[in-house]
Amino acid sequence: MTVKPLGNRLLIKPITEERKTEGGIVLPDSAKEKPQKAEVKEVGKLDEDYDLKVGDKVIFSKYAGTEIKIDDEDYIIIDVEDVLAKVED
């Protein structure tokens, strides 16, 4: 299934990192904070030049957007204004 966001929105895939305590215990998903880093998967028709494209990694507001599932994968549709920074390696 293909999802194309409308207007000033992005489809992003959260990047989750395995979390461990100092003692080496892996924390379950229910104990983790919501991720704030994601990869851009689709870009809507943006009104301005935000210099964002598919494949970019971004930091976004923690509770932004609408969470959806596509083919059993978690994605979020967010407003481009909720992107706080672009991560460059």
UniProtKB/Swiss-Prot annotation:
List the PROSITE patterns hit by this protein, alphabetically.
Answer: CHAPERONINS_CPN10
Record keyword Protein biosynthesis present:
no
Gene Ontology cellular component? cytoplasm
What positions belong to coiled-coil segments? Answer: none
Localisation: Cytoplasm
* The keyword Phosphoprotein is annotated on this UniProt entry: no
**Where does the secretion signal sit in this chain?**
none
UniProt keywords (A-Z) are:
Chaperone, Cytoplasm
Which GO BP annotation is one of this protein's? chaperone cofactor-dependent protein refolding
At the top level of its lineage, which domain of life is listed?
A: Bacteria
Known SMART domains for this protein? Cpn10 (SM00883)
CDD domains assigned to the protein according to its UniProt record, in alphabetical order: cpn10
Q: What one GO molecular function would you report for this record?
A: ATP binding
Major localisation = cytoplasm
PANTHER family, per database record: 10 KDA HEAT SHOCK PROTEIN, 20 KDA CHAPERONIN, CHLOROPLASTIC
Functional description taken from the UniProt entry = Together with the chaperonin GroEL, plays an essential role in assisting protein folding. The GroEL-GroES system forms a nano-cage that allows encapsulation of the non-native substrate proteins and provides a physical environment optimized to promote and accelerate protein folding. GroES binds to the apical surface of the GroEL ring, thereby capping the opening of the GroEL channel.
Describe, as the record does, how this protein assembles with itself and its partners: Heptamer of 7 subunits arranged in a ring. Interacts with the chaperonin GroEL.
Q: Which family does it belong to?
A: Belongs to the GroES chaperonin family.
Put simply, this protein is called: Co-chaperonin GroES
